[in-house]
């Protein structure tokens, strides 16, 4: 697993992406963050906002300055810590295969969920951003990530609710790609419009 170590946390993953963008001298980058990846792209945008043209959050965590994944989703703490202690030497959360997870899944480092994010650059809030909630056929208000789409609305971001499950990149990749290209094109043309509900 890339960068797997008990010492590596959220800041490690953020810096890894920042380094790639800087080394490759990339401009107008569109960052897409799924699930935990939402925290990563927020952190990247905080460090190098001028290189980022869009942020797209897919059913992801949407942290504020000083928060951790566990602080905004406390219902997950016991499960993940137990899994890490039982089968991950106390620091690595094993893949849960019970629901037919894809073979490409990898263990997750516990420290990434307990480390605080730094979001102190106001320029990141000027980046056109989109938040999609995947409600899995249920009312959006009942979804555990509904709090994040509410945050996105408060920030005047484009938002949309899909009936998909948490992992459309596995179950409906063509539909997901089509919708992503659509929103990227709209933002690129500067037609921000009103946030969708």
Question: Language-model features: where?
Answer:
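Active-site loop/oxyanion-hole signature of alpha/beta-hydrolase fold enzymes
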Residues: 1-30, 46-47, 72-74
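Short, amphipathic alpha-helical "lid/cap" segments that border enzyme active or binding sites
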Residues: 11-18, 173-181
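Gly/Ala-rich beta-loop-alpha elbow adjacent to hydrolase catalytic centers
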Residues: 32-33, 37, 41
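Flexible "cap/lid" loop of the alpha/beta hydrolase fold
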Residues: 46-52, 56-91, 112, 140-147, ...
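Active-site nucleophile elbow and catalytic-triad environment of alpha/beta-hydrolase enzymes
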Residues: 103-122, 143-144
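Catalytic His-Asp charge-relay segment
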Residues: 127-133, 159
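Conserved loop-alpha-helix segment in the C-terminal half of the alpha/beta-hydrolase fold
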Residues: 136-163, 170-172, 179-183
